[in-house]
Design a protein with these regions (language model features):
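Patatin-like phospholipase
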Residues: 1-198
Length: 198
């Protein structure tokens, strides 16, 4: 799968540096039976790859990921931008990387009938998807407030992208990667200043 092929062969990931990281890393996935977000602690990227895979398994597109007898899908269904969890964990400074531009408002899901049918055994998935736009928009308002109060530093695209959730056009993906890299580079000095402030 891409979760092994890319980091191990195509674009080797620096596993050694990650293993030396002193902080805590998490991935968030949605338990499709309970509808609750689950925050998996990531200690070893190779061993914990299914926890990462679960956090990015989109409804209708990906298979459910089974971990310890439970099934999971993308964390964005139940907690799209887990800043609140980070704050509750005691983090005073947070870096939030957004994939949408300032002013973006998520609209209601258009595939609800299909989602209800596909996840008939898991009604919480359809329920979450039905309210996802409301929760997402509330989270972005929370992020803006946290940014104003200095508890969050936000990196986001300057403009709307033209890349879909399941984009396969390599040139579009490369262009989006470059744009994201440039957006982060532009605010690097400001970010370093934010991190050094007490």
């Amino acid at each position: 799968t891409c979760y092994h092929l890319i980091p191990e062969y195509l674009y080797p990931f620096d596993y050694e540096t990650f293993s030396k990281y002193q902080g805590k890393a998490y991935s968030v996935a949605t338990d499709i039976r309970s509808g609750k977000p689950v925050y998996f602690r990531i200690r070893d990227l190779k061993k914990d790859i299914d926890k990462i895979r679960a956090s990015a398994s989109l409804p209708l597109v990906s298979r459910n990921v089974k971990i310890d007898g439970r099934e999971y899908l993308d964390g964005g269904i139940s907690d799209a931008i887990p800043l609140q969890k980070s704050v509750l964990d005691g983090n005073r400074k947070n870096i939030v990387v957004m994939t949408k531009e300032v002013g973006f408002v998520r609209k209601p899901a258009t595939q609800l009938p299909l989602i209800r049918m596909r996840y008939l055994k898991y009604p919480k998935v359809a329920e979450l998807m039905e309210n996802r736009h409301i929760n997402y928009n509330q989270q972005t308002a929370y992020i803006e407030n946290m940014q104003k109060s200095g508890k969050a530093f936000v990196i986001r695209p300057k403009r709307a992208g033209n890349v879909g959730r399941i984009e396969k056009d390599v040139e579009k993906l490369k262009a989006l990667y470059r744009e994201g890299y440039e957006d982060a580079a532009v605010c690097y000095e400001e970010l370093m200043k934010y991190l050094k402030e007490q």
